[in-house]
Amino acid sequence: MDPPAADVDAPFTTGAPFTESAIDLTGDGIPETILREDETLRVLQGDVEIWRSDPAWRVVDAALGDPNDDGRYEILAALWKPDEGGALGSHPFIIGHRGGTVKVIWGGSAVTYGIHEIALADVDVDSVEELLVLESAQPSDGLDAAQRTLSVWDWHGWGFNLRWRSEPGRYRDLGSTEDGIIVATVGK
């Protein structure tokens, strides 16, 4: 059941899209720096860039964790990329370190609802991270806020299964507190 819609001022959240953080992708005990700048995702080891997203992608958000429950840290990227006809589609991609290099290890098909914001959290306290997605119509169509939904997904071996989706217009922001607690802001 969804909570009643209400305007909530939540200044303690950081609901802006991902910009920078660090996580140990390579498993060597030294975290790599992950940057999102101008819709481009970059991975740095020290000052050396070891991976950059495809120039055709528009990376709108990212989350760091273990989205596919394989015991290794990865980057979950929310991105728009052109299909063969040039139309942009919204996709979730997992980027990880495999075989000595950082690369896309899973690329999801275009989704029906455009991905606006993402987070990884263990919402059901089973020691496995779920994917939280604030979805919307493509921002350029002007209907974004009224169509936002919050959905929860879990990994099933080679993709995500939808576990729950709110009614449209109930949620407006995903963020986190300074302690890393995920907060979904209610309201239009």
Pin down the residues of each PLM region.
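Beta-propeller-forming repeat regions
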Residues: 1-188
